[in-house]
């Protein structure tokens, strides 16, 4: 049976990536470009997360390639990486570039004539656009084009207990510096723990120059320190702001909780 190879970083699978899979004439094999020298930060997802998404959404066999460790010419990349996969069709986007000599999709088609190039005007979406939306807090715009709502994963760490003192204990994770920096402020968040989803309100801010997400799980009681959780971002509520005192802060948090409860009530209807 014919197999089709799709190639890309696939950083945040979106509807534009679907065009690659839809152009396939057979079962899809994905060559995941794990790292890119020109993109040292602002990643949407870790390589392992991108691999899992490809497997789940495209039912793909996934091969991973690290450009930073093996930065070779386009010809060598074709000979050593693409050819051994023995696929009968290649599908790439019009802006696809490969090799340390930065060759383009037309060069790839000269090497492999059965290469389908998805026109750029058909790829109205891009990971770069999604990154900008997330930096601006435009979560709902990003989620509308992503194949699954945007999430982060992390191990819960101990915070300064301030939220617990105020009556809203939180599960805190640090957001890795090489990932796209999300806008500081409050969010409606779904927390996944042991395959169970909990509604929550999260707050992103800088603590000692490190971006941290502090999330209150509505209706949850228990010890989550050291546990691996998934935080799915559903809606941006408000930007970070300074408060005149504890009462003003508590009032704002209460408003955040009401907005989150409203969002979850509407999402289940």
Swiss-Prot record:
GO terms for biological process: FAD biosynthetic process; FMN biosynthetic process; riboflavin biosynthetic process. GO terms for molecular function: ATP binding; FMN adenylyltransferase activity; riboflavin kinase activity. The gene is ribF. The keyword Thylakoid does not apply. Belongs to the RibF family. SMART domains: Flavokinase (SM00904). It comes from Mycoplasma pneumoniae (strain ATCC 29342 / M129 / Subtype 1) (Mycoplasmoides pneumoniae). Keywords: ATP-binding, FAD, Flavoprotein, FMN, Kinase, Multifunctional enzyme, Nucleotide-binding, Nucleotidyltransferase, Transferase. InterPro entries: FAD_synthase, Riboflavin_kinase, Riboflavin_kinase_bac, Riboflavin_kinase_bac/euk, Riboflavin_kinase_dom_sf, Rossmann-like_a/b/a_fold. It catalyses: riboflavin + ATP = FMN + ADP + H(+); FMN + ATP + H(+) = FAD + diphosphate. Its EC number is 2.7.1.26, 2.7.7.2. This is Bifunctional riboflavin kinase/FMN adenylyltransferase.
């Amino acid at each position: 049976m014919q197999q089709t190879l799709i190639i890309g970083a696939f950083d945040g699978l979106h509807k534009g990536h679907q065009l690659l899979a839809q152009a396939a004439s057979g079962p899809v094999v994905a060559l995941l470009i794990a790292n890119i020298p020109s993109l040292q930060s602002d990643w949407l997802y870790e390589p392992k997360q991108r691999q899992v998404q490809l497997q789940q959404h495209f039912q793909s066999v996934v091969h991973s390639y690290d450009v930073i460790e093996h930065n070779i010419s386009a010809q060598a990349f074709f000979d050593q990486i693409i050819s051994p996969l023995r696929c009968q069709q290649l599908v790439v986007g019009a802006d696809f570039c490969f090799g340390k000599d930065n060759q383009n999709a037309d060069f790839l088609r000269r090497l492999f004539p059965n290469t389908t190039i998805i026109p750029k005007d058909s790829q109205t979406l891009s990971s770069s656009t999604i990154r900008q939306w997330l930096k601006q807090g435009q979560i709902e715009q990003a989620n509308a084009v992503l194949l699954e709502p945007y999430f982060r994963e992390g191990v819960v760490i101990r915070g300064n207990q301030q939220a617990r003192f105020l009556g809203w204990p939180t599960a805190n994770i640090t957001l890795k510096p090489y990932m796209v920096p999300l806008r500081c402020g409050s969010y409606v968040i779904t927390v996944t723990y042991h395959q169970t989803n909990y509604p929550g309100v999260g707050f992103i801010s800088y603590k000692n120059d490190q971006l941290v997400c502090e999330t209150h799980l509505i209706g949850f009681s228990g010890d989550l320190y050291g546990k691996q959780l998934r935080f799915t971002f559903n809606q941006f509520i408000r930007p970070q702001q300074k408060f005149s005192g504890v009462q003003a802060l508590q009032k704002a948090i209460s408003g955040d909780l009401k907005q989150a409860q409203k969002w979850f009530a509407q999402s289940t209807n």
